[in-house]
């Protein structure tokens, strides 16, 4: 009886083996997925180099760059001017600074969040502070803080630095960036310019998504270093832009920002007073939204663009 049972089950085992082999041969290989992240050395903060490519295309504004940070998300409106959130919290609960100046939008509906006026490539470092465990990032800190930093250049001898990039992509994406710096022992001059634009996005069915944008930015900084421990700088920054929004029946036809600041630093004053820093600045934002300059209107059954 035992021998009969053994030979009766043997064909069934061959059948299962053949079926398993056929399933193994029909395995479908998927395209590889590239995940880019930032190496963390401090659990409470993350530092980014905005000039390093962290995503397939250079960041168009500050929110676009912050997407590469863990727990950071962005509310998309179109191709630009997204609203950043950290751990689900944004708005006034996420403080934004650029060159040690707080930036605020001009629209109560968050059509122009502070990051909409920031061009990441014009800065040297981005520091993201997680949570409210700090007293140096302003009041009302709940979600965290983001600082876009320009570092002080050091010139022991007279020298000149040049940096630039050009990016071309689909949907009429055009990016250009130029940064120049010249200086010596007693001072330096730095200037940067950037231009970002893209047309409307098309989905897989070739449907046009209202999401075009264009941005321009210029910065000029003059530094004076009469001694090794003294620094006096003056900075002026100008940005202009417009953005089409797909999430509402209104577009941002004007994103203008003019900002300037003066900074004085004196180090190694006494053994018990190591550094004195004075800073004064002003920022002016002009934001206009409308329903006609960047989109088609339906009038009497006809598509009319004003």
What are these regions (language model features)?
Residues 73, 113, 135-137, 165-167, ...:
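Outer-membrane beta-barrel domain signature
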Residues 22-155:
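Acidic, small-polar-rich N-terminal luminal/periplasmic segments of exported/outer-membrane proteins
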Residues 1-25:
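Cleavable N-terminal targeting peptides that direct proteins into the secretory/outer-membrane pathway or into
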Residues 198, 211-215, 229-276, 282-306:
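Flexible loop and strand-edge segments within Gram-negative outer membrane beta-barrel domains
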Residues 65, 87, 129, 149, ...:
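Transmembrane beta-barrel domains of outer membrane proteins
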Residues 32, 83, 112, 125, ...:
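Membrane-embedded beta-strand positions in outer-membrane beta-barrel channels/transporters
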Residues 147-149, 155-159, 163, 174-257:
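Periplasmic-side early beta-strands and strand-to-turn transitions of outer-membrane beta-barrels
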Residues 24-27, 136-137, 153-160, 186, ...:
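Short loop/turn motifs that connect adjacent beta-strands in outer-membrane beta-barrel proteins
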């Amino acid at each position: 009886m035992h021998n009969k049972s053994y030979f009766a089950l043997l064909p069934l085992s061959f059948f299962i083996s053949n079926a398993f082999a056929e399933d193994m041969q029909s395995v479908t290989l998927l395209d590889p997925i590239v995940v880019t992240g930032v190496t963390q050395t401090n659990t409470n903060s993350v530092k980014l180099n905005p000039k390093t490519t962290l995503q397939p295309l250079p960041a168009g504004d500050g929110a676009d760059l912050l997407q590469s940070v863990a727990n950071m998300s962005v509310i998309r409106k179109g191709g630009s001017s997204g609203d950043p959130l950290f751990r689900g919290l944004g708005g006034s609960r996420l403080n934004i600074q650029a060159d040690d100046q707080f930036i605020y939008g001009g629209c109560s509906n968050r059509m122009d969040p502070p990051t909409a006026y920031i061009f990441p490539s014009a800065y040297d470092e981005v520091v993201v502070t997680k949570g409210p465990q700090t007293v140096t990032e302003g009041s009302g800190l709940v979600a965290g803080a983001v600082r876009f930093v320009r570092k002080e250049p050091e010139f022991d001898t007279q020298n000149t630095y040049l940096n630039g990039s050009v990016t071309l992509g689909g949907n009429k994406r055009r990016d250009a960036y130029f940064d120049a710096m010249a200086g010596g022992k007693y001072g330096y001059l730095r200037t940067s310019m950037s231009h970002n634009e893209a047309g409307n996005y098309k989905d897989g069915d070739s449907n046009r998504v209202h999401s075009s944008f264009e941005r321009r930015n210029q910065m000029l900084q003059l530094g004076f270093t009469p001694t090794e421990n003294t620094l006096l700088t003056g900075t002026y920054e100008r940005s202009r832009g417009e953005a089409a929004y797909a999430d509402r029946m209104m577009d941002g036809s004007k994103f203008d920002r003019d900002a300037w600041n003066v900074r004085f630093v004196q180090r190694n004053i006494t053994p018990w007073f190591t550094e004195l820093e004075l800073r004064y600045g002003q920022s002016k934002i002009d934001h206009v939204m409308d329903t006609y300059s960047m989109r088609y209107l339906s009038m009497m059954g006809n598509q009319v663009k004003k």
